[in-house]
Amino acid sequence: MARQSLIQREKKRHKLEQKYHLIRRSSKKEINKAPSLSDKWKIHGKLQSSPRNSAPTRLHRRCFLTGRPRANYRDFGLSGHILREMVHACLLPGATRSSW
């Protein structure tokens, strides 16, 4: 189980990313449309002044049961070992174990 502080930090990043999403997207469009390099630098400075944690690359997918940041399956929102345990316990409908 991940520490609660890490999970809360990730939630805070997610809120910041949602808050600044439109601002960042519009700034990037302005950079692409700007005719001169000096205009691009001004817009880039505005983009850099937004909080670091508002960038979408700072987000991690976490297992919603354990909070584990690695080996997550997007379809289920679970980490690999929790997914395996739930499939073995028949708690996920439609998921089957492979055997060969």
UniProtKB/Swiss-Prot annotation:
User: Predominant location of this chain?
Assistant: plastid
Record flagged with keyword Nucleus: no
CC terms in the record's Gene Ontology section: chloroplast; ribonucleoprotein complex; ribosome
Q: Where is coiled-coil annotated? A: none
- Quote the subcellular location field of this record: Plastid, Chloroplast
- Any Pfam family matching the protein: Ribosomal_S14
Look up keyword Nucleotide-binding and say if it applies.
no
Q: Name one GO molecular function term.
A: rRNA binding
Task: Extract one GO BP annotation from the record.
Answer: translation
The alphabetized UniProt keywords are: Chloroplast, Plastid, Ribonucleoprotein, Ribosomal protein, RNA-binding, rRNA-binding
* PROSITE patterns membership: RIBOSOMAL_S14
Looking up NCBIfam families in the UniProt record yields:
PRK08881.1
The record's comment on protein family reads:
Belongs to the universal ribosomal protein uS14 family.
Q: How does it assemble?
A: Part of the 30S ribosomal subunit.
Q: What does this protein do?
A: Binds 16S rRNA, required for the assembly of 30S particles.
The identity of this protein, by name, is Small ribosomal subunit protein uS14c
